[in-house]
């Protein structure tokens, strides 16, 4: 992950601390903030992107993605999050990503009538879910499945900037959405392959799935 992202995240963590404390004093919990932020982002993506309001869609989703990150700051103020909170956060991230790409796919198909853009957005939709699943499934098996040239923060930055600029008020740049989605599609496929390779080369990856000592074998699902 880039140093720029790490520096930006560190600054956000510092700035969000007073807001996190205020939210906790108001009786909110990290899980409530996670659910509220995700619901708002999903609604924004599925109502604005499909009708071509890409600028406002990008603004709304960006705002609530940042708001959703507040749950982590709140958890830190409480001394750390819970296992359920981590699972809920990851689940909501997948829902948010899916809504963004689903909304853009709809606009590409029925608003722009662009088969090539539909293909790109569908690739991004599928790979965004599979990339995360590879990591979760690998970790559940005690293997390493992280890394790759692009992760969720970079993915969101690329798609939201591309979408926003394509519908920029007074000076739209329609080509930016096509470029952003194809760059993201290619990078996502590469990341998927990198994670599969990371799992394949992890220590113990080639051990038998069904133990010979009669222990219960792993299932194919985490």
UniProtKB/Swiss-Prot annotation:
GO molecular function: CDP-diacylglycerol-inositol 3-phosphatidyltransferase activity; magnesium ion binding
GO biological process: one example: phospholipid biosynthetic process
Residues the entry annotates as binding Mg(2+) 1: 68, 71, 89
Pfam families named in the record: CDP-OH_P_transf
Record key words, sorted: Cell membrane, Cell wall, Lipid biosynthesis, Lipid metabolism, Magnesium, Membrane, Metal-binding, Phospholipid biosynthesis, Phospholipid metabolism, Secreted, Transferase, Transmembrane, Transmembrane helix
Active-site residue numbers: 93
Cofactor(s) essential for the protein: Mg(2+)
Sections of the chain in a coiled coil: none
Textual note on the cofactor: Contains a di-nuclear catalytic Mg(2+) center.
Compartments where located: Cell membrane; Secreted, Cell wall
Main location: membrane
Catalytic activity as recorded in UniProt: a CDP-1,2-diacyl-sn-glycerol + 1D-myo-inositol 3-phosphate = a 1,2-diacyl-sn-glycero-3-phospho-(1D-myo-inositol-3-phosphate) + CMP + H(+); 1,2-di-(9Z-octadecenoyl)-sn-glycero-3-cytidine-5'-diphosphate + 1D-myo-inositol 3-phosphate = 1,2-di-(9Z-octadecenoyl)-sn-glycero-3-phospho-(1D-myo-inositol-3-phosphate) + CMP + H(+); 1,2-dihexadecanoyl-sn-glycero-3-CDP + 1D-myo-inositol 3-phosphate = 1,2-dihexadecanoyl-sn-glycero-3-phospho-(1D-myo-inositol-3-phosphate) + CMP + H(+)
EC code(s) of this entry: 2.7.8.-
Quaternary structure note: Homodimer.
HAMAP family recorded: PIP_synthase
UniProt family annotation: Belongs to the CDP-alcohol phosphatidyltransferase class-I family.
UniProt-recorded name of the protein: Phosphatidylinositol phosphate synthase
């Amino acid at each position: 992950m880039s140093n720029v992202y790490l520096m930006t995240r560190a600054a956000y963590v510092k700035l969000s601390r007073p807001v996190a404390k205020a939210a906790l004093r108001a009786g909110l919990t990290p899980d409530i903030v996670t659910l509220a932020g995700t619901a708002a982002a999903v609604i924004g993506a599925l109502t604005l992107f499909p009708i071509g309001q890409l600028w406002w869609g990008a603004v709304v989703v960006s705002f609530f993605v940042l708001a959703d990150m507040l749950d982590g700051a709140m958890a830190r103020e409480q001394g750390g999050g819970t296992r359920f909170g981590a699972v809920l956060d990851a689940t909501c991230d997948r829902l948010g990503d899916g809504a963004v790409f689903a909304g853009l796919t709809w606009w590409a198909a029925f608003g722009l009538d662009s088969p090539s853009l539909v293909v790109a957005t569908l690739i991004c939709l599928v790979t965004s879910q599979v990339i995360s699943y590879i990591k979760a499934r690998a970790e559940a098996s005690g293997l390493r499945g992280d890394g790759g040239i692009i992760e969720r923060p970079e993915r969101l930055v690329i798609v939201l900037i591309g979408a926003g600029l394509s519908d920029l008020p007074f000076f739209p740049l329609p080509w930016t959405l096509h470029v952003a989605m194809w760059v993201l599609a290619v990078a996502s496929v590469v990341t998927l392959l990198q994670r599969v390779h990371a799992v394949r080369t992890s220590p113990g990856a080639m051990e038998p799935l069904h133990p010979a000592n009669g222990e219960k074998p792993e299932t194919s699902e985490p």
